Amino acid sequence: MSLLKEFKEFAMRGNVMDLAVAVVMGVAFNKIVTALVDGIIMPCVGLLLGGINIAGLSFTVGDVQIKWGNFLQNVIDFIIVAFAIFVLIKLINLLQRKKANEPEPVTPEIQLLTEIRDLLARNSSKI
């Protein structure tokens, strides 16, 4: 089997494609959350704290500037993304649990076979 054919089979497998879609959606979702944090949440927090720009907060040690405001903004960004993923996983697990608890519908063939089994059991007990 050629290397190219093996790679194609690997890439087209369900799990790899699911992972690729998840990564693309994750990157897009991260951009949305970053825009939310940078454009809405942090300016509101800065306004509540007296109109300061949180992302611009820093202090200097010697010739080095420590930008702790930018770090704080990224921590808030991470917390929002992590919480959203947590909620999504909880929802998926809940839906899977509900689906697992549902009884499987009985097909007509199974119902007929069950009736035949019951009739045979009754007839054999009469003998």
Curated annotation (Swiss-Prot):
InterPro entries: Mechanosensitive_channel_CS, MS_channel, MSC/AndL, MscL_channel
Membrane-related topology note: Multi-pass membrane protein
Tree of life domain: Bacteria
Cell location: Cell inner membrane
Main location per the UniProt record: membrane
Record's GO cellular component terms: plasma membrane
Molecular-function annotations in GO: mechanosensitive monoatomic ion channel activity
Keywords, in A-Z order: Cell inner membrane, Cell membrane, Ion channel, Ion transport, Membrane, Transmembrane, Transmembrane helix, Transport
Signal peptide as annotated in the record: none
Keyword Acyltransferase attached: no
Classification via Pfam families: MscL
Chain segments annotated as transmembrane: 9-29, 32-52, 75-95
PROSITE patterns reported for this sequence: MSCL
Main function: Channel that opens in response to stretch forces in the membrane lipid bilayer. May participate in the regulation of osmotic pressure changes within the cell.
Family to which this protein belongs: Belongs to the MscL family.
Assembly and oligomerization: Homopentamer.
Protein name as catalogued: Large-conductance mechanosensitive channel
Organism: Legionella pneumophila subsp. pneumophila (strain Philadelphia 1 / ATCC 33152 / DSM 7513)
